[in-house]
Amino acid sequence: MKLLKNNIYINVYLKNKQEIFEFVFKKFKEDGAVLDSFLPAIVERDKAASVAIGNYLFLPHPVYDEIANIQKEKMVFIGLKDVINIDGQPIKFICGLALKGEHQMDALQSLAIAFSDPEEVEKLVKDKDLTQDKVLEFLAKHN
């Protein structure tokens, strides 16, 4: 599953988990990708184990049982206007996943690899002119 340019949002002002979950859900729901049960499923997944994985990345994705209810696979990437703190981690980037089976595992692995180099991630964090194209280049370069 490839991240599409029109699913990348830059300089978004969100200040906490709930706002992030609602924004991600709204973007998926607008496209008919998920059912209403998706929002509580991503909240539940985060309660089981934080989806703030370090290196400025937050990865909302549903509990396993919700995957069968995904109507259309989709990814969204959000670059926050400001770094916020979630579960003791600084967060600047969010990648919401509405993916099934292997696609979800592949995306999680690819994102973990892309965000594994602290120096490269720091460059992305400090980029004041971040664009959708730069995000796509960053992800492609590191996978």
From Swiss-Prot:
Subcellular compartments: Cytoplasm
Domain PTS EIIA type-2 as annotated: residue spans: 1-142
GO MF annotation, one: protein-phosphocysteine-sugar phosphotransferase activity
Keywords (A to Z) from UniProt: Cytoplasm, Kinase, Phosphoprotein, Phosphotransferase system, Sugar transport, Transferase, Transport
Active site: 61 (tele-phosphohistidine intermediate)
Listed GO CC annotations: cytoplasm; plasma membrane
Matches recorded under InterPro entries: PTrfase/Anion_transptr, PTS_EIIA_type-2_dom, Sugar_PTS
Stated role: The phosphoenolpyruvate-dependent sugar phosphotransferase system (sugar PTS), a major carbohydrate active transport system, catalyzes the phosphorylation of incoming sugar substrates concomitantly with their translocation across the cell membrane. The enzyme II CmtAB PTS system is involved in D-mannitol transport.
Protein name listed in UniProt: Mannitol-specific phosphotransferase enzyme IIA component
Species in which this protein is naturally found: Mycoplasma pneumoniae (strain ATCC 29342 / M129 / Subtype 1)
Organism placement in taxonomy: Bacteria, Bacillati, Mycoplasmatota, Mycoplasmoidales, Mycoplasmoidaceae
Name of the gene encoding the protein in the UniProt record: mtlF
